[in-house]
Amino acid sequence: MARDLGPRGKMCRRLGIPLSRITAKDPDKDPVLRRPYPPGQHGATARTSVSDFARRLREKQKLKLYYGLMEKQCRAVFQEASRAPGNTGTVLLQLLESRLDSLVLRAGLATSIRQARQFVRHGYLHVDGKRADIPSFRVKPGSEVRFHAAHQKLAVVQESFSRMKSRSVPAYVQVLGEGEGLRYVRLPEREEIPVDVNEPFIVEYYAQRS
């Protein structure tokens, strides 16, 4: 499937997302925090009015960047969330947090959503003892995700956990051992999800186009 693999620094600056929020980048060296304005010659001085549509579109684009989604995937998850009981925006984020690649990132077993997806696709991980190699695999609360013993010892896996273990892990995820895997404890509350988006805007964006 086609995927946007452009420079994340530019994408983050354009959307105002600190690069350190989606990768292992040191916040002190984060280009978005050092230059909190869009890229380009006039990024720091440009003055433009922003329409309601542009605000909604921006929030949707931020969500896609946080989770590494294509438009078709993002719309499909929204449609599922809109059919579920509860607040659509919160349910949308809960569904995305329940993805296998998202949980691997939240547990600090990977340095970015791209690397988490790579670990999954290469078959490094098992969910409740069964191999899972689809990044969008929906993990159920109470399930355990573990590296296969041989893969857990790989240098890239060990290095990723070493770089990320100083980061805080949300309460709905429990790290098993020294980077052996994770337990998905429960569905997260909205305030626990480390994603800075205005989800009502995202709901409005898709609702107007359904």
Swiss-Prot record:
Part of the 30S ribosomal subunit. Contacts protein S5. The interaction surface between S4 and S5 is involved in control of translational fidelity. GO terms for biological process: ribosomal small subunit biogenesis; translation. Pfam families: Ribosomal_S4, S4. The keyword Cell wall biogenesis/degradation does not apply. This is Small ribosomal subunit protein uS4B. CDD domains: S4. It comes from the Bacteria. One of the primary rRNA binding proteins, it binds directly to 16S rRNA where it nucleates assembly of the body of the 30S subunit. InterPro entries: Ribosomal_uS4, Ribosomal_uS4_bac-type, Ribosomal_uS4_CS, Ribosomal_uS4_N, S4_RNA-bd, S4_RNA-bd_sf. Residues 22-49 are annotated as: Disordered. PROSITE patterns: RIBOSOMAL_S4 (PS00632), S4 (PS50889). It comes from Myxococcus xanthus (strain DK1622). Residues 23-33 have a biased composition (Basic and acidic residues). Gene3D superfamilies: Ribosomal Protein S4 Delta 41, Chain A, domain 1 (1.10.1050.10), RNA-binding S4 domain (3.10.290.10). One of its GO terms (molecular function) is structural constituent of ribosome. Keywords: Ribonucleoprotein, Ribosomal protein, RNA-binding, rRNA-binding. Signal peptide: none annotated. GO terms for cellular component: small ribosomal subunit. SUPFAM superfamilies: Alpha-L RNA-binding motif (SSF55174). Belongs to the universal ribosomal protein uS4 family. Transmembrane segments: none annotated. Residues 98-161 form the S4 RNA-binding domain.
